[in-house]
Amino acid sequence: MSKDDSIKKTVTIGLSAAIFFVLSCFASIPVGFNVSIETSVAFLAFIAVAFGPAVGFYVGLIGNTIKDFILFGNVSWNWVLCSALIGFIYGLPHKIIDLKYQVFTKKKIVYFWLYQVAFNFIIWGFFAPQSDLLIYGQPPKLVYLQSFLIVISNILAYSVVGIKLMSMYSCHYNKQATLIKINNS
C-alpha cells in the first residue's frame, strides 16, 4: 500500500466514523426494547464495500465507541467489537462488488443483500446476545428479542439506505470512468 493510499484510508476512517456517530444520534428510528433502525449500519456496509475490510473494521470500532461513550456514558465493548467485526465482514467482498470500477448490478445487489442478511444473523443474532449473556448475565428472553429486532432493523436499513448509497456511488464513478474513456479516445 502506498503512502497516499494509507493517508486516504486514514482520512476515510476518521470522517466515516464521525458520520457513523452522527447518523447513530440523529438518523435512527426507535422500535422499542432499546433497539433502533440505524442508518449508520447501512452507511457502515457502504463504506466497508467501497473501501475494504480494514476501513469497515475501524469505522465500526471507532464510530460505535464514540456513540456509546457520548450517548450512554460507557462503552459496551462486546457490541463495539461486533460492530467492528461486521464492518470487516461487510468489506471482504469489496473486490468482487467493486463499486468504483464496475456497475452495481442486480446480481451484485442480491449477492450482497443475502451476504449481509447471513452475517447479520451470525453477528447480531448469535455472537452479540451470547456475549451479553456471558458478560452481563441479562435475561435470555430479552437479549434474544433485542437481537432479533436488531437483525431485522439492520436488514431493513441496508435494504432501504445501503443499496441506494452503493448504487449512487457506483453510478457516479462509472459515469466518470465513461467520460474519461470518451475524452481519451
UniProtKB/Swiss-Prot annotation:
Keywords: Cell membrane, Membrane, Transmembrane, Transmembrane helix
NCBIfam families: PRK13661.1
GO cellular component, one term: plasma membrane
Name this protein carries in UniProt: UPF0397 protein PAM_019
Family: Belongs to the UPF0397 family.
Membrane topology: Multi-pass membrane protein
Localization annotation: Cell membrane
Residues that span the membrane, as ranges: 13-33, 42-62, 69-89, 109-129, 143-163
